[in-house]
Amino acid sequence: MSKTSPRLSSLIAELKSVARDSGADVWHDVADRLEKPRSTHAEVNLSRIERYASEDETVIVPGKVLGSGALRKSVTVAAVDFSSSAATKIEHADGEAVHLEQAVEQNPDGTDVRVIR
């Protein structure tokens, strides 16, 4: 199925390319999830990230991060998109909210990441 969003199409192509070059299955898995219809993309609240992530960990969300709940841990969250309240709360917890494109550039091997959906 073709995507109408040029950003999402290029992100999927980049994820597949990096996965092929580095052998990182995590990026291939994220690309496969993003290729599916948007209604199946993850919508993850901060409370879920708080529950399952460890301190100073990188969390990958193949979808959107929403601002419901509190985040007290300093984590790096990489996602396709963030609600404004989620990005604010992540930064107040001394964390970092980055887009998936940046996460792929920083960690092409996909090591030490946790996918939450």
UniProtKB/Swiss-Prot annotation:
UniProt-recorded name of the protein: Large ribosomal subunit protein eL18
Species lineage: Archaea, Methanobacteriati, Methanobacteriota, Stenosarchaea group, Halobacteria
Record-linked Pfam families: Ribosomal_L18
Record family assignment: Belongs to the eukaryotic ribosomal protein eL18 family.
Keywords linked to the UniProt accession: Ribonucleoprotein, Ribosomal protein
GO molecular function: RNA binding; structural constituent of ribosome
Any one GO cellular component localisation term in the record: cytosolic large ribosomal subunit
Superkingdom as given in the UniProt entry: Archaea
Gene: rpl18e
HAMAP family: Ribosomal_eL18
Transmembrane feature ranges: none
Record organism: Halobacterium salinarum (strain ATCC 700922 / JCM 11081 / NRC-1)
